[in-house]
Amino acid sequence: MATFNPQNEMENQARVQEYKVSTGRGGAGNIHKSMSKPSPVLLPLKSNSKTVANNNNNGSNQEKVPRFAIGRGGAGNIFHDPHLTRSAQQLDSNDNINYNDVINDIDDYISPITSDMVDEGGSNPVTNTRSRISATRSHQSLHATTSSPNNNAPIVVGRGGAGNIFFNKKKVASNGGNEEDEIRGGNIEDEDTINANEDNLFVVTSNGNALAAIKSTSKKPKNKLKGKSAPEKFAIGRGGAGNIISPKSSRNTINHNLNDDDEDKFNLKDDNGKEKKKKKKKKSGFFSSLKTMFN
């Protein structure tokens, strides 16, 4: 028969009531166990806390200064505030607090939900508050964007593969005879953005070196179909076959001439003629004559 042990029962209750509290971002040392649910900002007061004299009692009583954690990990996130003591935290209902001073001290202060924020139609006050906050943030971000000088629009591109190869716009004749813009492959918005910022494009090679993409001065490849010019390709991206630039950047460093192909063909014919002459010389030797005698 099992006997009742009050000590084991107390230990079981203590295990149930334990809380795991995290006071930072770094390492496992910021997780500790607590029997009570502590404040997320104020750490429990310990014996190693600094003491400060109470000015009201002429320094006769000593009060311990609470410690605070600002949540970045390590011992550097714990600091002492000698002005905020335990007695200072005990607020009575009759105390007059200037909340405007509190709001000004906090950068990301969000006002509580009050009666004037709730619409008469009975809309959700939380949604209403969020909409006001989002509207304020969007106004601030818009003001910051327009006020900053030389603010260039960013170019969002892919990370490699065939999807980051675009074609430049060209003029084609429509059925009515008017010229229209035609884009083959890619998105129209992306194409317009890239064409407007061609000077700011960068080519990222496989070894991670970034080279400025300069407009190519080489001749465009001829198209077999008359009246149609091949669109100018250029690729942007970080990996895969998409970081091979043609013809905008890769042809800047490679001087390709169409006459080189003709010279290569001529050299190939010359080499073939030399090989045939060598074979004839071998056949006209002494051993070749002996072979013909026995054959």
Swiss-Prot record:
Bias kind Basic residues: ranges: 217-227, 275-284
Taxonomic superkingdom: Eukaryota
Basic and acidic residues compositional bias, start-end: 265-274
Residue ranges with Polar residues bias: 134-153, 246-256
Compositionally biased spans, kind Low complexity: 285-295
Chief place where the protein resides: cytoplasm
Post-translational modification: Hyperphosphorylated after treatment with rapamycin in a TAP42-dependent manner.
Residue positions, PTM Phosphoserine: S36, S39, S47, S123, S138, S141, S147, S246
Cellular component aspect of the GO annotation: cytoplasm
Sequence segments annotated as region (Disordered): 134-156, 217-295
Pfam families associated with the record: DUF3602
Positions of modified residues (N-acetylalanine): A2
Protein task: Involved in resistance to cisplatin.
Note: Present with 1140 molecules/cell in log phase SD medium.
Protein name: Protein PAR32
Organism of origin: Saccharomyces cerevisiae (strain ATCC 204508 / S288c)
Lineage summary: Eukaryota, Fungi, Dikarya, Ascomycota, Saccharomycotina
